[in-house]
């Protein structure tokens, strides 16, 4: 297996699940966890180290800083604050996430990072574009999950309602990840 180093920024609900999924699937050789809450990082690192003990592969899990991300192949951006979304509008997080992105992207790029960035943070399309512009990376190196989750939800519901296996359903959500998307 090619050695792959992945950094996960933001260890809330989504970031912690991303890290766990990467550990269990064994598709990374090293995982670096970064969050402003050091106690959260320490807890997640220990939980992930414990969780992989029965997996058929070993992943090195480490706490880190933005400076430790320079040699990552991929960074997954999960920074956000769901408490700002009282109205269930993903745009409510925008001022917080814009400020966070502008702060951390400079630090990450100063570390020599030249890998790929996958953005999950809301509002996904706006933040993905901002990461691309702030990083100076080529367009093909910055991705957003966009309506991927919404597409999964649609296919799941169609499968449950029709009895057709989800693997046999081709359906997509398009548009902005939010109220303006459509099937």
What residues fall within each predicted segment?
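Glycine-rich Rossmann-fold phosphate-binding loop(s) that bind the pyrophosphate
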Residues: 11-12
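Mobile gating loops/cap/lid regions near enzyme active sites that modulate substrate access
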Residues: 155-183
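N-terminal Rossmann-fold NAD(P) dinucleotide-binding loop
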Residues: 15-16
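Aromatic pocket-lining residues of Rossmann-like dinucleotide-binding sites
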Residues: 22
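Conserved N-terminal Rossmann-fold NAD(P) cofactor-binding segment
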Residues: 36-72
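Rossmann-like NAD(P)-binding element
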Residues: 59-114
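Rossmann-like NAD(P)(H) cofactor-binding subdomain of soluble oxidoreductases
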Residues: 90-147, 152-155
């Amino acid at each position: 297996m090619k050695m792959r180093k992945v950094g996960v920024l933001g260890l809330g609900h989504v970031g912690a699940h991303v890290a766990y999924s990467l550990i269990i699937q064994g598709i990374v050789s090293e995982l670096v966890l970064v969050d402003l809450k050091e106690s959260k990082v320490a807890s997640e690192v220990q939980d992930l180290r414990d969780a992989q003990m029965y997996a058929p592969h070993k992943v090195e899990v480490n706490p880190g800083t933005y400076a430790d991300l320079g040699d990552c192949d991929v960074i997954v951006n999960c920074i956000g604050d769901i408490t700002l979304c009282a109205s269930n509008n993903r745009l409510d997080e925008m001022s917080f996430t814009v400020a966070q992105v502008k702060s951390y992207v400079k630090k990450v790029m100063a570390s020599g990072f030249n890998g790929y960035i996958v953005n999950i943070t809301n509002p996904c399309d706006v933040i993905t574009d901002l990461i691309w512009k702030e990083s100076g990376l080529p367009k093909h190196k910055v991705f957003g999950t966009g309506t991927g989750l919404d597409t999964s939800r649609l296919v799941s519901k169609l499968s449950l309602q029709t009895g057709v296996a989800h693997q046999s359903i081709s359906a997509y959500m398009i548009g902005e990840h939010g109220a303006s998307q459509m099937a």
